[in-house]
């Protein structure tokens, strides 16, 4: 019988799930790992839910860094931020290969599991790169800069360092409307990740009277050259689903 280990869709829970699956000693071919919510249940499978444990997460992370490489850890972390259903099981299989081959496993793209990890990492990295360019802030009451995004992958912790470096003395928030989480950066302090309640989300979603919104829209429309408009090229470089929270398209 196949045993399926399941957990919440966050990094701590996923690393704990890896720990428990490995410690079960059921055999790598006899287990699968999935993030919740689980869609269709498979027949003849034993499902085991795993709760996040910070100590077990730290143990797994130490093992990855010391027995494989720091590069492999970064690869695993970014793949864990993906929205792909197979990401957790792919991470587990990659770690099995990594503990066998060592640091060079990241170069073994001929191995299907390594290639799949590379694809997950690349997709997440590309999305994070786009959001660094497309994030727009609005000034909320209390002089807090707030931005809303709805990324497919969980890229908040990947884009936050960029804005922490560029806006170190500003109070700002980047809110993931899809996951109800936010990166909060108090002025001249380190940023942190937090979960938002529905009431907090509603309060932070109110329209602001920031005058720079209209100024930016006017600038965007004014610099455009009508004879050179190419909407197909624009959609290729800036997909439509990014535009919901972009000031110039509202």
Label each region the model flagged.
Residues 48-56, 189-201:
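Acidic, Ser/Thr-rich peripheral helices and adjacent loops at domain boundaries
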Residues 13-24, 93-97, 158-165, 213-221:
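Short, hydrophobic/amphipathic alpha-helical patches that form generic packing surfaces
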Residues 171, 182-183, 187, 201-250:
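Long, compositionally biased intrinsically disordered terminal regions
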Residues 103-193:
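Internal, well-folded beta-alpha domain core
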Residues 74-79, 177-178, 229-235:
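Short coil/turn segments at secondary-structure boundaries
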Residues 34-131:
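Charged, alpha-helical interface segments at or near domain boundaries
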């Amino acid at each position: 019988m196949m045993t399926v280990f399941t957990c919440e869709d966050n990094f701590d829970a996923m690393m704990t799930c890896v720990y428990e699956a490995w410690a079960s000693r059921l055999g790598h071919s006899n287990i699968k790992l999935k993030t919740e919510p689980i869609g269709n249940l498979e027949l003849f499978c034993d499902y085991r839910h795993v709760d996040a444990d910070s100590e077990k997460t730290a143990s797994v992370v130490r093992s990855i860094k010391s027995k494989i490489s720091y590069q492999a850890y970064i690869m695993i972390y970014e793949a864990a931020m993906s929205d792909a259903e197979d990401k957790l099981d792919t991470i587990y299989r990659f770690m099995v290969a990594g503990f066998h081959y060592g640091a060079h496993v990241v170069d073994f793209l001929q191995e299907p599991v390594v290639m799949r990890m590379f694809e997950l990492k690349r997709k997440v990295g590309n999305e994070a790169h786009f959001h660094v360019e497309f994030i727009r802030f609005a000034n909320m009451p209390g002089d807090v800069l707030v931005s809303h995004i709805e990324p497919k992958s969980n890229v908040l912790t990947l884009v936050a360092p960029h804005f922490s470096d560029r806006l170190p003395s500003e109070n700002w928030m980047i809110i993931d409307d899809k996951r109800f989480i936010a990166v909060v950066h108090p002025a001249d302090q380190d940023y942190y990740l937090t979960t938002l309640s529905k009431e907090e989300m509603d309060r932070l979603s109110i329209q602001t009277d920031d005058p720079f919104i209209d100024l930016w829209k006017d600038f965007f429309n004014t610099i455009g050259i009508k004879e050179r408009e190419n909407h197909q090229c624009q959609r290729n470089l800036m997909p439509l689903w990014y535009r919901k929270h972009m000031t110039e398209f509202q």
